[in-house]
Each structure stands twice: as structure tokens, then as C-alpha cells.
Amino acid sequence: VVAHAPEDESHARAALAVLTEFAQSVAHRLPVGDAPVRVLVAPTAAEFQKHARSFLPGQVSGLARPSEGLMVVRPPTLRAGGGAGDFGTTLRHELVHILLARNVDDALMPNWLNEGVAMHLSREYQIASPVAVAQMFLEGRIIPYRDLDMAFMTPGEEREFNDAYAQALSMTRHLHRRLGEEGFWALVLALRDMPFPDALH
């Protein structure tokens, strides 16, 4: 179900097509289930910010409320440069959060892995390029593991927020390389029943 202003009808149709195709492509790992997924294409920046109060204005282009099966996204017209390609990426990213909540226990899954899986599946690789992560290391900006989850819960300064995402994706891709495709998904789906440290062992 895609809610939208009349002027955003073409974006709503595009969103439905992107989400339908993506959901089918990941259904063997993360089935959507019987509950509907609701999408709100925000008609204005102010309307979007009402839903994104915990973020700085312009800090994110989409957000998910997995327990409600809801995602709220900015259409390309509310993105810098028109961002049509980014629109599809945002839709896929937010859908992954909803699918993870339906297939694992959110409370057992670290926030960094939740974000990392969302970026991995939506192919947001640029944020954690080897050069970007190396720069973080050289500048002493690597976030200690014990603090990483909190960086997603209390988004503040823009650079630290972006660093948290880059680090999450880098760690997730490392896990994927080490464990392989099947091992990685066995780990993720084990989080239905056990906390991450136990699943990792």
C-alpha cells in the first residue's frame, strides 16, 4: 500500500514496482509474510520531518517503523539533484528493516548488523569503500564496538552518523566474506532465537 500526494503518483508507481521486485528477490531469505507493508511518500519536507524527529533535517531520506510495517520516504523531488536512483535504494533499504523485524528478533540483533544487512542487500557500497574506511582509521574516527549500536539510536553530528553507517557496512561485508553466503544467512536467521554472540559461535 503506497500513500502519496496526487502530484507524486508516478513516484508511488515506481516505488511499488521497486518494492515488489525486491521483495521477490529476497523472499527465500526474508519472506514478507501476510501482513501488509505500508509506504508513505512524503508530500513535503516538513511532513517527512514530522516522522523523522529523531534525525537532523536532511540527515536521512527514509525511515522504517518495522513494528507498524511502515516506511516513510522522500520522493526524488525532495532530494538533492532529483535522486531517482537513490529513491530506489532507500526503498530497498527500509524494506529490509521491515523484513528483518518479521524474520528475526529485533531485540537480539545488534543495530549495526541490522543497518549493515539493509545496506548490503540494497547495495549501498559506496559509503564504506576501502578508501572511506581507511580514512576513518587514519583520522582516529573508528567508533569502539561497545559504542556503535548507540550511534544509531542517538543520531547527532553528521560525520559520526555517517561513520557509524560506513563501519556497520564494512563489518557486515567482512562477516559475509568470512562466513560465505549460506553461513552469513544462517547467522542472521539464528537471531530469531539467540543473541548475536551465541549465533556467532
List where the protein language model places each region.
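Short, solvent-exposed loop/turn and secondary-structure capping segments
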Residues: 50-53, 130-133, 187
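Secondary-structure boundary/capping residues
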Residues: 35-36, 127-130, 184
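Active-site-proximal alpha-helical
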Residues: 26, 141-200
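Post-HExxH zinc-binding segment in Zn-dependent metallohydrolases
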Residues: 108-151, 201
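Juxtacatalytic substrate-recognition/specificity segment
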Residues: 1-110, 125, 139-142, 162, ...
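Active-site recognition of the HExxH zinc-binding catalytic motif
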Residues: 89-102, 115-119, 172, 180
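Generic structural signal for hydrophobic core residues of well-folded globular domains
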Residues: 99, 103, 121-125, 175-179, ...
